[in-house]
Amino acid sequence: MSLILLPAVDVVEGRAVRLVQGKAGSENDYGSALDAALCWQRDGADWIHLVDLDAAFGRGSNRELLSEMVGKLDVQVELSGGIRDDDSLNAALATGCARVNLGTAACENPHWCAQVIAEHGDKIAVGLDVQIVDGQHRLRGRGWETDGGDLWDVLENLDRQGCSRFIVTDVTKDGTLDGPNLDLLASVSDRTNVPVIASGGVSSLDDLRAIAKFTERGIEGAIVGKALYAERFTLPQALAVVRM
């Protein structure tokens, strides 16, 4: 099974940006979010990981734009950012996206999250945004501004609720081009039987080769952001590596 690559388009005020370690104010602007997504589609992407950072930070939303983008793309879209209640969930699903990624809600409102998982099944993934502090694996919420509890406790609860997929990010790696946290990915994939998508730190084709070795252990895909925008490699090059 080949590793699925999901180019990331993180949106702030309609622009495609990349943050460093998820910190507001660390944005690098890469132009129109729609143009970025269409570029990755032209380059061969099967999926786009589309994130409303304004909604994630609770400072507004790009809801109309994201809906327009999903409508104009021919590839599958995983939609994320600020989806924490029925209104934001229904708006996300109404775009026609293939999958919605919940983050903060899994920590702050586990009862609602369980209901959503039960109702929508594999259209729901949960993002596990992890920060390792003094050896403890802590989850981060609200745009990585708040503590969301112990990773392993939350993972066990979500597994029990029937969550169909997890997106695992080491927040200290995201946007740094420092390489992925392979130990974290292995630990999570070994504790669940559902697919895991890796996120954060990919900087080279060798990083993708390393992640691809974990497909038999349940790593289904990898989100790639900064490395593509910084032209460390092209998407066609990356796809060729993981499809070998």
Swiss-Prot record:
**Which pathway?**
Amino-acid biosynthesis; L-histidine biosynthesis; L-histidine from 5-phospho-alpha-D-ribose 1-diphosphate: step 4/9; Amino-acid biosynthesis; L-tryptophan biosynthesis; L-tryptophan from chorismate: step 3/5
Please report which protein family the annotation says this sequence is part of: Belongs to the HisA/HisF family.
List the GO cellular component terms. cytoplasm
Please identify the protein, giving its name as recorded: Phosphoribosyl isomerase A
Q: Name its species.
A: Mycobacterium leprae (strain TN)
Offer an example of a GO molecular function term for this protein.
Answer: 1-(5-phosphoribosyl)-5-[(5-phosphoribosylamino)methylideneamino]imidazole-4-carboxamide isomerase activity
Catalysed reaction(s) here are: 1-(5-phospho-beta-D-ribosyl)-5-[(5-phospho-beta-D-ribosylamino)methylideneamino]imidazole-4-carboxamide = 5-[(5-phospho-1-deoxy-D-ribulos-1-ylimino)methylamino]-1-(5-phospho-beta-D-ribosyl)imidazole-4-carboxamide; N-(5-phospho-beta-D-ribosyl)anthranilate = 1-(2-carboxyphenylamino)-1-deoxy-D-ribulose 5-phosphate
NCBIfam families (alphabetical): hisA-trpF
Which Pfam family, just one, is annotated for this protein?
Answer: His_biosynth
Q: What is its EC number?
A: 5.3.1.16, 5.3.1.24
Q: Which UniProt keywords apply?
A: Amino-acid biosynthesis, Aromatic amino acid biosynthesis, Cytoplasm, Histidine biosynthesis, Isomerase, Tryptophan biosynthesis
Query: Single Gene Ontology BP term?
Result: L-histidine biosynthetic process
Where this protein primarily resides, as one coarse class?
A: cytoplasm
Q: Does the keyword Isomerase apply?
A: yes
